[in-house]
Amino acid sequence: MGNLAELLKSRDNNFNFIRMVAAFFVLVSHSYPLSRGAAETEPLMAQLGITLGGLGVFTFFCISGFFISLSYERSKTKIDFVVARFLRLYPGLLVVLLLSAWVVGPLFTELSLHDYFSAKEVHRYITGNLKLKDIQFQLPGLFQDNPYPGINGSLWTLYYEVLLYAMVFALGVVGCLTRLRRVSVFF
């Protein structure tokens, strides 16, 4: 068994398993209010003081912080880091937003296609959500009878992911991510 640096060079490190468990926690946690309404919380909330979803999201952010720091350390230049973070986030986000607004929305809306595509909210859903601030979760006529009539409820996390990118970048610029400074900052 190698040290952490050696284990991270391969994909044999169980992070995918941890991500799968965290995703399952979020799925279970969200199933209660999505199927039964906002007042319904998962049964373990009273015993744990945190939902499984909260624990899953916390786990995702911890893993992200670890890998984002690793990305900064492996980047040849600061520009490489910024470009890598942009390319990690925005192409996938754009695809999700376009598919949601232009495929899922038209297939499941209660409106006519003309009314759906004429609504300003469809275009704002794409352009506004690319800004990652004040996320718009609803599309016109889509899932209106659901306890939560939105789509892509997890988009809110991306704003905090970008804040984490900025924090790692700032810590790297001031030298807190170098091996010697890491020890002095945390001890």
Specify the residue positions occupied by each region the protein language model found.
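Solvent-exposed interhelical
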Residues: V162-F187
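Membrane-interface helix-loop-helix regions
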Residues: L48-G54, Y90, L94-V162, A166
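Juxtamembrane transmembrane-helix termini
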Residues: G2, G56-L87, G92-D115
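Functionally critical transmembrane alpha-helices in membrane proteins and complexes, commonly lining
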Residues: D12-Y72, Y90-L93
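Membrane-interface helix-boundary motifs at transmembrane edges
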Residues: D12, K76-F81, V174-R182
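Structural signal for membrane-spanning alpha-helices in multi-pass inner-membrane proteins
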Residues: H30-P33, S100, V104, G172
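Transmembrane helix-loop junctions in multipass membrane proteins, especially transporters and channels
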Residues: S35-E42, R74-S75, G105-L113, L177-R181
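Short, Lys/Arg-rich, polar N-terminal cytosolic tail immediately upstream
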Residues: M1-D12
